[in-house]
């Protein structure tokens, strides 16, 4: 930390104000400030240069004016940088566990440089660099943890069971399907375009897939793909899709409630009408968030890293270039514009 402080410009994506309905690019704006490339003397903070920013559906919730119930889901602060998962390189450190030049992933501001004041709570070191660094925004980061533990811990899949994944081509869904296939399950996914449907079958190895936008009766579609019913539903959509799934669950089926992207931008969320199916089919539904499992990150890596190296898992990313394109990339999630995990590359290592 010794030496003369060096100040550099720092582009930031600022959150303008709380959002109602679909987010727009104009709900964010770009500004440039300056930042010293040294952590404050005596501080245990870590200063990082951000390389990749992660765009994730949960961020829409943080754009709303939320009650302060859960610090993991607090609102973004108007006038401050958007916060999200990112991959970064340590520029300077006052913390004994983080050294200059090391690569990390965790929660950062949407900016070129971030000062992380609680690195032991917010940062994970990157040890495996024989894969694309951007994977730590997805496959090897929060979405991967979400996919793996939502499937294994909540749903406990058994060989031969029938698994349905909604929003299946997204950051989490594409992994759930592949993990379930590795565990010997029959897997069907739904997505919003023919391109994504083909991706599910040809790239990710799903047994079947369908375009939900071309199906006028989702109950009938699910009966077609699951004539004997669904054992496991990995829930990413909510609303009418959840209603249709409940009619098609098998006795003692399990539902991991990961997200409900169809509801995030509605002024009035849709109700669910087929809840009695939960009772007479003895269906288990459990909600969870990725933070619940961060302490088990090493267990996840033990499973997924060998699978990547052996070519058993593949991952598709949609990478936008430049921090100035980050607002459009985030907003595009909610119209299905992305194909695969949405990432923004803002610097090279």
Language-model features, listed with the residues they occupy:
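Eukaryotic N-terminal low-complexity, Ser/Thr- and Lys/Arg-rich leader segments
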Residues: 1-36, 348-349
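C-terminal capping/lid region of NAD(P)-dependent oxidoreductase domains
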Residues: 2-10, 310-319, 327-349
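Glycine-rich beta-strand-centered segment in the early N-terminal region that forms part
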Residues: 36-55, 63-110
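Short, well-ordered loop/turn sites that connect or cap secondary structure elements
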Residues: 97-98, 157, 249
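A structural motif shared across PLP-dependent enzymes of the aminotransferase-like
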Residues: 107-123, 296
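Mid-domain Rossmann-like dinucleotide-binding core that forms the NAD(H)/NADP(H) cofactor-binding site
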Residues: 133, 137-215
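Glycine-rich phosphate-binding loop and adjacent beta-alpha segment
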Residues: 237-313, 347-349
């Amino acid at each position: 930390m010794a030496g003369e402080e060096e100040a550099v410009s720092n582009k930031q994506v600022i959150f303008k104000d709380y959002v109602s309905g679909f987010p727009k690019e104009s709900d964010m704006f770009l500004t440039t400030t300056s930042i010293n490339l040294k952590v404050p003397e005596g501080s245990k903070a870590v200063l990082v240069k951000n390389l990749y920013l992660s765009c994730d559906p949960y961020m829409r919730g943080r754009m709303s004016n939320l009650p302060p119930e859960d610090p993991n889901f607090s609102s973004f602060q108007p006038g401050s940088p958007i916060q999200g998962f990112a991959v970064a390189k340590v520029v300077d450190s006052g913390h004994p566990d983080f050294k200059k030049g090391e690569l990390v992933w965790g929660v950062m501001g949407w900016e070129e440089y971030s000062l992380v004041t609680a690195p032991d709570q917010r940062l994970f070191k990157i040890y495996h660099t024989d894969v694309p660094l951007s994977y730590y925004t997805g496959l090897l980061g929060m979405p991967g943890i979400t996919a793996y533990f939502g499937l294994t811990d909540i749903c406990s899949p058994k060989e031969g069971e029938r698994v349905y994944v909604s929003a299946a081509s997204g950051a989490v869904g594409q992994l759930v399907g592949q993990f379930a296939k590795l565990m010997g399950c029959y897997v069907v996914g739904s997505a919003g375009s023919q391109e994504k449907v083909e991706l599910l079958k040809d790239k990710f190895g799903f047994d079947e897939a369908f375009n939900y936008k071309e199906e006028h009766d989702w109950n009938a579609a699910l009966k077609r793909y699951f004539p004997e019913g669904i054992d496991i539903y990995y829930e990413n959509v909510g609303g009418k899709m959840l209603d249709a799934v409940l009619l098609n669950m098998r006795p003692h089926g399990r539902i991991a409630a990961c997200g409900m992207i169809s509801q995030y931008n509605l002024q009035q969320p849709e109700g669910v009408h087929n809840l009695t199916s939960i009772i007479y089919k003895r269906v288990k539904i459990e909600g969870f968030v990725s933070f619940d499992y961060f302490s088990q990150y090493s267990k996840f890596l033990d499973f997924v890293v060998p699978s990547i190296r052996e070519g058993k898992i593949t991952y598709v990313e949609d990478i936008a270039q430049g921090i100035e394109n980050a607002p459009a990339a985030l907003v595009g999630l909610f119209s299905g514009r992305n194909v695969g995990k949405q990432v923004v590359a803002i610097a090279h290592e």
